[in-house]
């Protein structure tokens, strides 16, 4: 076990201990009548982790909630970053903002308490001290979470092993518990604006194709431990010398990643926003990424993609791979037991060539 893995386990354990302590301290949920879906008119979803990919995948849940409760208002507590994704979801009525900090969530809870929500949803694996305090202040009619038998503030719960099931299965289980019937659409959903399409089109018109293919690379993940190295991508460009490589990302982060390297002749950067970059990736022959947000985006838009994950080829999948792996056939998953920056260039080239063929 690496130090980083040990540290993550330690932090998860401490988080669980704080949550269990808070559950005992904060007491039970207010007395409520038996759950009745016909009485649900106001829903609040906690999505303040600020993760873009999680917000995108939440489109499955939000669409299902709107189908189950067509006249209800569905509000979301979000972070400043993932609001970019949630804001254009047609099922969302209003966004409210909070960090994962205790003070921020309590302040948000006090603000929203007067709305008297009928249904509160927190689908994280375990609640935190801050999220429990938020729930205590909010006092919704019904509050749902998985495996919350030891947390009396939740008056709706069901048991599920969240470490081995895909995130869409988690959302489906929640919706079924709440009363959803019939076939559930588990595809991801995102809307791309016309202005994004125009911006990407203008950029594409400036490229000198020369008969080659377009390979779009998102080299940077949320963590440096999951990002590609410049050496890898420059190495790939030499394997495919007749193709054009477009590097996606924020300008300052790409500059730091390049570390003074000059771009190769058939290599350019594209530093516009998420939606413009998504349109550009749609036009590519293949997208290469180590980042789960871009994997979810590729699934939503059916982009031909090679997604590099940390993990081992084993079945059944467990942990991060089990929960967040791509299910869309357009996305091929490459598993590597170490950090993504250590994947050999020849291995990346082989999988890219398979997709390009």
Mark where each language-model region is.
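Catalytic machinery of carbohydrate-active enzymes
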Residues: 1-357
């Amino acid at each position: 076990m690496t130090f980083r893995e040990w540290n993550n386990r330690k932090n998860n354990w401490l988080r669980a201990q704080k949550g269990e302590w808070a559950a005992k301290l904060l007491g039970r949920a207010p007395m409520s009548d038996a759950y009745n879906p016909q009485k649900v008119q106001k829903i609040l979803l906690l999505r303040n982790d600020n993760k873009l990919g999680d917000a995108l995948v939440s489109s499955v849940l939000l669409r299902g909630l709107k189908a189950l409760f067509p006249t209800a208002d569905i509000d979301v507590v979000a972070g400043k970053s993932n609001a970019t994704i949630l804001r254009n979801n047609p099922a969302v009525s209003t966004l409210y903002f909070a960090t994962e900090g205790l003070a921020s969530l309590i302040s948000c809870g006090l603000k929203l308490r007067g709305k008297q929500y009928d249904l509160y949803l927190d689908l994280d694996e375990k609640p935190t001290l801050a999220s429990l305090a938020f729930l205590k202040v909010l006092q919704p009619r019904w509050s749902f979470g998985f495996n919350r038998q030891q947390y009396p503030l939740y008056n709706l719960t069901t048991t599920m092993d969240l470490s081995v099931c895909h995130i869409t299965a988690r959302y489906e289980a929640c919706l079924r518990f709440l009363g959803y019937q019939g076939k559930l659409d588990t595809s991801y959903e995102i809307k791309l604006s016309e202005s994004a399409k125009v911006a990407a089109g203008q950029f594409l018109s400036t490229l000198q194709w020369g008969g080659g293919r377009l390979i779009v690379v998102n080299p940077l993940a949320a963590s440096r431990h999951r990002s590609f190295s410049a050496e890898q991508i420059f190495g790939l460009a030499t394997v495919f010398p007749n193709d054009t490589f477009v590097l996606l990302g924020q300008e300052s982060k790409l500059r730091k990643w390049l570390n003074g390297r000059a771009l190769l002749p058939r290599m350019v950067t594209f530093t516009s926003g998420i939606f413009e970059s998504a349109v550009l990736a749609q036009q590519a022959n293949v997208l290469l990424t180590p980042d789960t947000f871009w994997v979810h985006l590729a699934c939503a838009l059916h982009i031909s993609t090679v997604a590099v994950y940390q993990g081992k080829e084993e079945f059944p999948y467990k942990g991060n791979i089990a929960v967040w792996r791509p299910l869309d056939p357009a996305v091929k998953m490459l598993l590597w037991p170490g950090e993504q920056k250590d994947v050999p260039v020849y291995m990346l080239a082989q999988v890219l060539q398979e997709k390009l063929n």
